[in-house]
């Protein structure tokens, strides 16, 4: 009887193992791009365009018309977009940074600036709580066309994205809402 009981238990365990639901496992992928060759900007834009739920951007210099346009289009697609930028680099009256922030704010995208640090030098985009774009690439024309820069996208790595989201949130809480100025 003991032997029969063991067989039944073993059969039951094997059945449970074979037919138990398997959690989805994602294999992270990594892609690098460089400028001024153009692949860094394309990676940044692709990160924004492929977002399905949320985009959290934090940046130092923000003057890129292409990135500004892509973020506005994402907002128009229903994506939850929020942008956090260094105050000193982007707030000079009449600057391209002010123009870009005004465009975002007028499109209904919450924009905040941070001034508590000598510079807020982060350059990162987190999308859908699982993808991270980071590197030296500023979201600017100079980064795309003149500077030697790099961008790295790590896709399908929720634990890494969560680490970056916590950092982003800590800076967001320090930030001040951008008021549109003309």
Identify what each model region corresponds to.
Residues 1-4:
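N-terminal secretory signal peptides that target proteins for export/translocation
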Residues 9-21:
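Bacterial N-terminal signal peptides
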Residues 22-27:
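Sec/Tat signal peptide C-region and signal peptidase I cleavage site
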Residues 31, 56-59, 82-85, 112-113, ...:
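Structural recognition of the beta-strand scaffold that forms the well-ordered cores
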Residues 36, 59-63, 85-89, 115, ...:
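A mature extracytoplasmic/lumenal domain signature
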Residues 42, 120, 127, 131-182:
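Signature of lipid phosphatidyltransferase scaffolds
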Residues 46-109:
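Primarily the HKD phosphodiesterase
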Residues 64-69, 90-99, 120-123, 134-135, ...:
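Extracytoplasmic/secreted cell-surface and envelope-processing proteins
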């Amino acid at each position: 009887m003991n032997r029969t009981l063991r067989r039944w238990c073993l059969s039951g365990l094997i059945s449970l193992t074979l037919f138990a639901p398997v959690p989805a496992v994602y294999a992270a992928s990594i892609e690098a791009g460089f400028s001024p060759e153009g692949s860094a900007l394309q990676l940044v834009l692709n990160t924004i365009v492929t977002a399905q739920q949320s985009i959290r951007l934090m940046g130092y210099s923000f003057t890129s018309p292409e990135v500004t346009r892509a973020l506005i289009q994402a907002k128009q697609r229903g994506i939850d977009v929020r942008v956090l930028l260094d105050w000193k680099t982007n707030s000079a009256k009449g600057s391209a940074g002010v123009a870009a922030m005004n465009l975002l704010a007028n499109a209904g995208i919450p924009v905040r600036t941070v001034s508590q640090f000598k510079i807020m030098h982060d350059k990162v985009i987190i999308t859908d709580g699982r993808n991270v774009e980071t590197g030296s690439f500023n979201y600017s024309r100079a980064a795309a066309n003149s500077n030697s820069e790099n961008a790295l996208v790590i896709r399908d790595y929720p634990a890494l994205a969560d680490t970056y989201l916590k950092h982003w949130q800590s800076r967001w809480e320090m930030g001040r809402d951008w008021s549109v100025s003309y």
